[in-house]
Structure formats: C-alpha cells, structure tokens
Swiss-Prot record:
Additional remarks: In fish, myosin MLC1 and MLC3 appear to be produced by two different genes unlike in birds and mammals, where they are produced from a single gene by alternative splicing.
Alphabetically ordered keywords of this record: Acetylation, Motor protein, Muscle protein, Myosin, Repeat
Coiled-coil features, chain-numbered ranges: none
Superkingdom as given in the UniProt entry: Eukaryota
Residue list for modification N-acetylthreonine: 1
Organismal lineage: Eukaryota, Metazoa, Chordata, Craniata, Vertebrata
Protein name stated in the entry: Myosin light chain 3, skeletal muscle isoform
Length: 148
C-alpha cells in the first residue's frame, strides 16, 4: 500500500501525540495503540512480530521514530482484514436458538478467553448498550464493533 502525502502528514501528527518525552519517538509498547488510532486493527501478535519479537523489557524501554514506524504501518495495512460477514459467521456458531442473538454472558467468556483475550473493562466498554435482556443481537454488535 502506498499512502498519500496527506495521509503520511496525518500519521506523523498522530504519531507525535504519543511522544510523551519530546524526542520525536515512541515506546515499542505504544505502537499497537498508534496503529489502532490510525484505523488499523492489528493483533498484538502481529505488532510484536513486526517489531522483531522484542522482550517485555524492550517493549517498555525501546523507542522508535516515525521513519521506522511508517514501514510497519504499511505492513499492517497490507494484512488481510476480517469482514463483516467473517465476524457474523464467527458469532453465528454461538446462536443456539437460530434467532440472531447470542447470550451476553457467553460472548463475554469468549472475548475474555479465546484468541486475543480482552480484559473485563475492555469487554464492558465494547458491550455497553449492546445487551437486551441478557442477549446480544450479533449482527448489530458486529456493526457496532466495526464502527468504533
């Protein structure tokens, strides 16, 4: 993917907002958040791999500048993206009644235990306003997630 000059300027500006020290660099452990702020949705595993599988210590202490970050962003942008249909199909497996809903409690368990595990506060934020008498309409839920 080639980004336009305007996009790169926007990316650079966003990158700068994460520079807490003022040295025009960010910590390795901020890279995933910056990518997500720029509309990407990499897994933590993807980002760790792109960073060269750094140790926990390196994640906290190593820093990189925008020129090192941009090729990483391009790499993430090129990764295959899950589609609306992919997510709906994945949730349909949990639709026991075949009525377009999944149990909220079951969805919470899935989000906290499978794949890239989410924390309780992350799940609460994601599911805010999505439960209707203990059930979640998963097509609406996927639309909600994809618009966040």
């Amino acid at each position: 993917t080639e980004f336009s000059a305007d996009q790169i300027e926007d990316f650079k500006e966003a990158f700068g907002l994460f520079d807490r020290i003022g040295d025009s660099q960010v910590a390795f452990n901020q890279v995933a958040d910056i990518m997500r702020a720029l509309g990407q949705n990499p897994t933590n595993k993807d980002v760790t791999k792109i960073l060269g599988n750094p140790s926990a210590d390196d994640m906290a202490n190593k820093r990189l500048n925008f020129d090192a970050f941009l090729p990483m962003l391009k790499e993430v942008d090129a990764l295959p993206k899950g589609t609306y249909d992919d997510y709906v199909e994945g949730l349909r497996v949990f639709d026991k009644e075949g009525n377009g809903t999944v149990m909220g409690a079951e969805l919470r368990i899935v989000l906290s235990t499978l794949g890239e595990k989410m924390t309780e506060p992350e799940i609460d934020a994601l599911m805010a306003g999505q439960e209707d008498e203990g059930s979640v309409h998963y097509e609406a839920f996927v639309k909600h997630i994809m618009s966040v």
